[in-house]
Amino acid sequence: MENYSEVRAILERLCGAKGVSGAEDGAANAAAEMLAEYMPVHRSALGSVCGSLEGSGAHILLDAHIDQIGLVVTAIDDDGFLKVAKCGGADIRVLAAAEVTVHGKKDINGVITSTPPHLASASDEGKAKAFDEIAIDIGMKKEAALELVSPGDRVTFDGRFLSMLGSRVSSPSIDDRAGVAAILRCLELLRGREHSCRLSVLFSVQEETGGSGAQTGAFEAAPEQAIATDVSFGSAPDVSSEKYASLGKGTMIGYAPSLDRKMSVRLAAIAKEKGIASQPEVMGGRTGTNCDEIQISGSGVRTALLSIPIRNMHTAAELCDLADI
């Protein structure tokens, strides 16, 4: 079995840093430090991590988003419970009794409240609560909570970086630290080699809340072509095989009206030529990734999408196969 220790170490470090959309500094700082080993780095006005290597050929941008899904505190009620809203597409079905960290004036442990099954009404059995019914218990009364927590503070879901059997790992924020890890590993493989293009890298903020980091970062870089790396749907026992890709069988190459078909075909040809496993991912319109924003940046950018299949997307236990990175 191939040793994936290098990419595993990169991914574990990235997943250990926090960075909910709009408050990405922890994760962005970690990514910037790692990117600085390969190129000059700066942070954009929105906080995206940007870098560039000079070259004489076409200007190509590699993008992956650095933000992760989470929650944002909206209010503190009279009993000291924190009311929250989604920051990105958190899966409400798995939130009951979840352990979280509230990033206030200091990091505070919390648990999302859960109604005991004994007290739930028959009509509510098996149903997820509406978001306005969710609260976080931090073990404090309102006065004490107000000293440490303010509306707007971000909340992350707790979870460990788990090494599974074989080459699979599970962790919060694999979406999209796996894409960031792929680019960093690519740069390591390119170190010391001549390349015939000008290469820019963008670890963009705020993808989970609309893609503003990618749109502004691509405008600043002004590339001729771009490749975004993100995650997509991996195999699951309760989902039709037509709707996902298999874990461990390679990166997904995107085909969509919003993507440049010549680039997608070229990427597939290179993968075949080099013996790199890949899988097609066909979409009928927009991709739901940063490609949608990069494509319309400036006067337009030819864009391709490479996605890593994962399971349990938008939960604290996202799972991927390192072979696909």
Where are these regions (language model features)?
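N-terminal hydrophobic/helix-forming segments and targeting peptides
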Residues: 1-325
